[in-house]
Amino acid sequence: MTLQRVSPDGILDLTIIGGGPTGIFAAFQCGMNNISCRIIESMPQLGGQLSALYPEKHIYDVAGFPEVPAAGLVDSLWKQTERYGPEVILGETVISYRKLENGDFQVVTASGRTFVSRALLLAAGLGAFSPRKLPQLGNISPLEDRSVFYAVKNRADFRDKNVVIVGGGDSALDWTVGLMGVARKVTLVHRMHEFQGHGKTAREVDEAKESGAIDVHLSTEVSAIDLNGDTLQAVHLKRRDGITSRVEADRLLLLIGFKSNLGPLADWGLELVDNAVEVDGHMKTSVDGLYAAGDIASYPGKLKIIQTGLSDAAMAVRHSLTYIKPGEKIRHTFSSVKMAKEKKSEGQNA
């Protein structure tokens, strides 16, 4: 491991708020640019939503990975980054920041801990998120993570079960296909008359329906559930034309999206656009020395995918150098050259 260089006063160069793919890659870019950093992540593990909600979901649109499990992508990003030894603070939520007289930034967490750095990078995704629920089902919290789920964290939870999936977007379609051969039976319910997910996956779902591998109910909503104590037994469906039906179910998988909330970040006085932080072409916010990258950053033409977040991270770290080390000439070093030098140095010190 190449330990990061810390200034004589012990203050790190950059604090990265958020430990998802964007935040992890930002830490790697710090290492590539010879600046020290820390990641502060509110969850108990790195990876953001990929670790918390979709560890077994496969991702197909990250360059260089024809197909990769979400957890595998997080592992690869960290393996790439850990050589630089960034400080990682888990289970801490940053609630406020203050720009000090000397231009440094101090952040405060919900538990009262404070951290100081030369600059600040927001990589907090969409902020805090909570799953959308079906109000007609009332309080189903006692069933959550037992028979009602909002994400697939472990396929074994659905093995040999009668699974009803609600939703018509990418996650619902992906797991309809992904749980075939795992669940005893898969039933997909969507309130619209057509799917909103990726066309290729939608065609796979249509083909599975035609072959009898799954059941699909369009223009249909879940109206109620049957319980035996605290055990799910069945789901009641109601079509738009009023026709009702009952489907046996051991598991109800609600994949109808998440509600995001910037939380305390919304009160930081930053310029906001559509619940995201506005940045310029250098990923700088309206506050000098404070940058944003990934889903939390907004600029014209922004595409909210992992690949874009990684690019944002590289751009933000690169341009943060002008604030962290004012007056110094920024030199670009190709990764192949830098790694060759580091490996040579490691070999000499072994």
UniProtKB/Swiss-Prot annotation:
Domain of life where this protein originates: Bacteria
Catalysed reactions, as listed in the record: 2 reduced [2Fe-2S]-[ferredoxin] + NADP(+) + H(+) = 2 oxidized [2Fe-2S]-[ferredoxin] + NADPH
Entry similarity comment: Belongs to the ferredoxin--NADP reductase type 2 family.
Protein name: Ferredoxin--NADP reductase
Keyword annotations from UniProtKB, A to Z: FAD, Flavoprotein, NADP, Oxidoreductase
Single GO molecular function: NADP binding
PANTHER family: THIOREDOXIN REDUCTASE 1-RELATED-RELATED
Quaternary structure and interacting proteins, as annotated: Homodimer.
Gene source species: Chlorobium luteolum (strain DSM 273 / BCRC 81028 / 2530)
InterPro entries, alphabetized: FAD/NAD-bd_sf, FAD/NAD-binding_dom, Fd--NADP_Rdtase_type_2, Ferredoxin-NADP_redctase_2
Disulfide bonds: none
EC number(s) stated in the UniProt entry for this protein: 1.18.1.2
Binding site for FAD: 22, 41, 49, 54, 94, 129, 295, 336
Cofactor(s) required for function per UniProt: FAD
Cofactor note: Binds 1 FAD per subunit.
